[in-house]
């Protein structure tokens, strides 16, 4: 989905208006989605910085970062994972853990270690390209 970050931002705004004490994000059984959405979503909770490294088949490593210095929510955060939390959901959860931004609870994630990027062709055709992430 290409609107996850926008939708989560709206939810956060609603929760802030209610003066909640914290937010729980449930990623259980979430198979992932757009890598860019995972990066942008992470950016709602961190100031700026690297979110994920992508290693191409040629061995080149590319670091994907959040460049937006604003933090949309800096309160208490809890993320629920299970063995079906995969792909970009793992990236989001892992980034929050790496930044000590929230408490990550539940089971170990799927451990997919890859994401798919779609190359859009003329018309409505798309080709999924897998990349290794770390």
Regions inferred by a protein language model and the residue ranges of each:
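C-terminal "exit" segments of structured domains
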Residues: 125-134
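Cleft-lining beta-strand/loop regions that shape enzyme active-site pockets
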Residues: 1-125
């Amino acid at each position: 989905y290409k609107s996850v970050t926008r939708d989560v931002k709206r939810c956060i705004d609603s929760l802030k208006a209610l003066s909640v004490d914290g937010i729980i994000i449930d990623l259980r059984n979430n198979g992932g989605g757009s890598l860019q959405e995972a990066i942008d979503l992470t950016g709602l909770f961190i100031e700026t910085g690297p979110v994920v490294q992508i290693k191409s088949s040629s061995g080149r490593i590319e670091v994907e970062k959040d460049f937006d210095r604003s933090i949309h929510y800096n309160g208490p955060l809890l993320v629920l994972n299970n063995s079906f939390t995969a792909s970009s959901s793992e990236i989001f959860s892992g980034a929050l853990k790496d930044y000590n931004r929230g408490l990550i609870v539940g089971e170990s994630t799927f451990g997919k270690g890859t994401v798919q990027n779609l190359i859009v062709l003329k018309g409505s055709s798309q080709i999924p390209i897998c990349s290794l992430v770390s």
